[in-house]
Amino acid sequence: MVPVIALVGRPNVGKSTLFNRLTRSRDAIVGDLSGLTRDRQYGEAKWQGRTYIVIDTGGISGDEEGIDAKMAEQSLQAIEEADAVLFLVDARAGMTASDQMIGEHLRRRNKRSFLVVNKVDNLDVDLARAEFSPMGLGEPLAIAGAHGRGITQMLEAVLGIFPKDAGEPEEGAEAEEEVQEGQEAKRIPGPSEKDGIKLAIIGRPNVGKSTLVNRMLGEERVIVYDQAGTTRDSIYIPFERDDEKYTLIDTAGVRRRGKIFEAVEKFSVVKTLQAIQDSNVVVFVMDAREGVVDHDLNLLGFVLESGRALVIALNKWDGMDQGQKDYVKTELERRLFFVDFADIHFISALHGTGVGHLYKSVQAAFHSAVTRWPTSRLTQILEDAVSDHAPPLVNGRRIKLRYAHLGGANPPLIVIHGNQVDAVPRAYTRYLENTFRRVLKLVGTPIRIEYKGGENPYEGNKNKLTDRQVNKKRRLMSHHKKAEKKRKDKRK
């Protein structure tokens, strides 16, 4: 399970600054979702190959009223959601009554907490830490969030308490074994495939995720899974269809079949982000009657940035007239252009219409995401693409793209080597992405392209001459000087 870390503290102690610094490696932030995360912002971050989720909260001062009280309530809720808490204090302001109140709350909750003394730049670090040591939350960690000082030591301490998931492959691990030249493209099973394709059902509240989950598992099955753990835990349900194994990651909560139609699903951003990270393929459920809303776009953006294979399901399609259907299709084409690689299905989870067709798209998306190709195949596609549409000129020189190889899978990462690659326009990268997708027949998975510049192996090396060459050089220089002197004498 991906660790969840909450940032809490008084207002203006640097929580948002630290949040932005931690999540900058992956610009995939789900935040300010109306009515859901109004006062909490969620982001994904990576450090030394480990993924974790960060929650940024509003400040707590202890005397809140009105909207400030709501912000404090959201902060306390974030503490309950998190696996660990970074409690930020301001070294310049010193310890306050609000700091002591928050520290007391953390001690009572018995939550794994780390006291982080921020803004220690230009201060005596030892004195700053000593002032907050009596709070009883362990040895304070000193950082300067705005300048990045102390962040590495802080992350070592925090992430060190979480065991690495032995079943979670490192990014790009699927592509470590090189496909030999002349071999066909092949798929190497990942560690998760023994339990089948991990399938996450994601979507806004009340779009029909519960109904779809039960439909996929079989109408006669009453879901009574009630696993021990915190309220963040998703439910993992193995099942088979047509001799294919799947593991369904259910984020919609524990429910009984007789109640799912009346129940209002509780939406948890943490559950959603963790399910996306742990899945192989995401089935994104939307309400056809409501069309595409901003919340859908936010969640789809996170799926795209996570690199997971994607299938889109428009639910409640059967209750619409033809005019409404035509309008929704137009909106899908207009607003979902950034995930145009994903198959879209129009279904009714309640009546089962179209649900069976989802599996074919799930299988196709998964296989596209993990298939690997030899360098010769990718380089040939690159050469054909460059031949059809050459890269632009930069300062009068043509960008040269020499060869391509696979750098990772799920999602496919294609590494292209060449010269002046820093100047490749985004439009040309998009052209290459579409070309690789079309030729390799990739469906349902994002594709990423990374450039690497050519390196001159002789750069910085001096040309070493032999003794004979050195003597010859001296003779030539001496001869040149004598000839130059004779020319000057003649002019006189």
From Swiss-Prot:
Compositional bias per record (Basic and acidic residues), positions renumbered to this chain: 461-470
GO molecular function: GTP binding; ribosome binding
Name of the protein: GTPase Der
Family matches, as InterPro entries: G_ENGA (IPR031166), GTP-bd (IPR006073), GTPase_Der (IPR016484), KH_dom-like (IPR032859), KH_dom-like_a/b (IPR015946), P-loop_NTPase (IPR027417), Small_GTP-bd (IPR005225)
The family this protein is said to belong to: Belongs to the TRAFAC class TrmE-Era-EngA-EngB-Septin-like GTPase superfamily. EngA (Der) GTPase family.
Classification via SUPFAM superfamilies: P-loop containing nucleoside triphosphate hydrolases (SSF52540)
Ligand binding (GTP 2): 203-210, 250-254, 315-318
Known role: GTPase that plays an essential role in the late steps of ribosome biogenesis.
UniProt feature, compositional bias: Acidic residues: 168-181
Residues covered by the EngA-type G domain: 3-166, 197-370
Organism (species): Ectopseudomonas mendocina (strain ymp) (Pseudomonas mendocina)
